[in-house]
A protein has these predicted regions:
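Conserved anion/nucleotide-ligand pocket segment
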Residues: 78-107
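Extended hydrophobic packing segments that form well-structured cores
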Residues: 110-230
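Catalytic phosphate/nucleotide-handling subdomain of diverse soluble enzymes
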Residues: 40-79
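Acidic, His- and aromatic-enriched active-site or binding-groove loops in soluble protein domains
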Residues: 30-38, 43
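A charged, amphipathic alpha-helical module
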Residues: 1-20
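Extended, charged helical/alpha-beta scaffold domains that provide interaction surfaces
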Residues: 16-33
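Short, glycine-/Ser/Thr-/acidic-enriched flexible segments
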Residues: 12-14, 71-72, 107
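Conserved active-site and cofactor/substrate-binding residues in soluble primary-metabolism enzymes
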Residues: 2, 6-7, 46-50, 209-213
Length: 230
């Protein structure tokens, strides 16, 4: 209708307006559907992660997950809590090192590629009142899936990228879900510190595969710096 090729929305301000409560809706599924329809779509008006998402989607022809990065400290959560009981025989075991959690209610079904079969999904609700449709996708269905992380700085001149692999995926009954857990090359804690010191901000864009080299080449062509954390 509007011929748009990108989308974002002020999620927290939207909630404060009470319009979602009145209309019983949240923007989460819109973001998921947009991305699977090849339209970069970012939460919370975060244009720094939106730029990274756009570069990654256009470059690889794959859909992109995005979310809040949270440092999970060594020994603080069991493997069962990290959504990993199917992978190991001791679900009560804990990690002896830090891992990175990424959570948001905007998973996608075309992480493998726009020309590949869609991943399976199930519908869920965002609120405790049972409204606010979004869906869950098991982002740990392939053990050890290699992924690339990306985000631009606030000036839009530099992009930090990192590589990791998937450890587990936890579905939560409400709020931002799924929560996906990743091992980061170079260390999860060190990655978070590098993001803070570099002035990069918060959300991360995640794409299947190691695409660091292609992003570096794209940066040379388009004119932005790529900082590779590892």
């Amino acid at each position: 209708k509007y011929d748009c090729n990108a989308f974002t929305t002020p999620c927290k301000e939207l909630c404060a307006s009470r319009l979602p409560q009145q209309n019983k809706c949240v923007p989460c599924m819109t973001h998921s559907l947009n991305k699977d329809d090849r339209i970069p779509s970012a939460c919370e008006e975060d244009l720094a992660v939106w730029m990274a998402m756009m570069m990654m989607m256009y470059l690889t022809r794959q859909s992109v997950f995005m979310g809040n990065p949270v440092l999970v400290l060594a020994g603080s959560k069991t493997l069962e809590q990290l959504g990993m009981p199917k992978l190991l025989t001791q679900p009560g075991q804990t990690f002896d090192h830090d891992v990175l959690e990424i959570h948001h209610a905007v998973p996608v079904r075309r992480m493998r590629g726009f020309d590949q079969p869609e991943q399976k999904y199930e519908l869920a609700h965002f609120t405790t009142q049972g409204w606010g449709a979004h869906y869950h996708v098991d982002m740990a269905e392939e053990e050890g899936q290699v992924v690339t992380f990306g985000r631009f700085n606030r000036q839009g001149t530099r992009m930090m990228v990192a590589v990791g692999h998937t450890l587990g995926c936890e579905f939560r009954p409400v709020y931002c879900s799924p929560a996906v857990y990743y091992e980061i090359e170079g260390g999860a804690r060190e990655f978070r510190q590098a993001l803070a010191k570099g002035g990069y901000g918060h959300h991360q864009a995640i794409i299947y595969g190691n695409h660091v080299k292609e992003l570096q080449e794209l940066g040379e062509i388009v004119g932005f710096e790529v900082e590779y954390f590892h």
